[in-house]
Amino acid sequence: MTHILIVLSAADKWTRADGSIYESGVWAQEFVDLDEAFVRAGFKVDLASPGGIVPTMDKRSLDPNMVGENVAERMRTYLDKNAERIENPLVLAEVDTAGYDAIVVPGGHGPVEDLYKDPDMGRVLIEADKADKVIAAVCHGPAALLAARDEHGRWPFAGRKMTSLSDEEEIEFGTAENAPWLLADTLRKQGALFEQGPNWHAYVVKDGNLLTGQNPQSSTPLAEVVIAALR
């Protein structure tokens, strides 16, 4: 059976440039759309987080005024149904990548608080990439890629095509001002061949085993590309 590891941020905040706190976490739709699609495809899905900490869903991602009544209700229903799994993630440091076919990272601002600098996240990604396993991330999830460094301190994803939430979308969302750093800009500076589509429209980039989606709207299309790659 195909076995997928979804790595969830353990952060419940994003520390801003001035030290103020922006309450955050995992963007619910990005987790739900990916997890639901993988389970429906018949894959076994494990969840992990730094320290095995129970992930926090960004409250904005469950706000009907933000995402719409239907989406908010679907998110809450799925999260409630899967509460036991979500509340008992594996400890990321204890993950053996040999047992997985794909490593997947949803976004929300959580990853730009913790996963981007988490050494265990980096190890998991390095091991997965060396074994040519599928690596997928969406929205702010590609921040996790920044944690990966090879034995020479180099970023193994330099020169690879990828996408993430664009700087323009960060500005439109209202979180670019006072941000300690912007994800798309940072990925470019690290050497990524960054691509993006229209704001808030689905856009997925495939470069070998690296699959990335731009925004929440890209979650289901990304899941479909991951599933196709694993068939």
Regions found by a protein language model. Give the residues of each.
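Conserved, well-structured core segments that form or line functional sites
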Residues: I135-A136
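Catalytic nucleophile serine of serine hydrolases
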Residues: C139-G141
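Extended, subdomain-level signal for the structured scaffold at the beginning of enzyme domains
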Residues: M1-A131, A143-R231
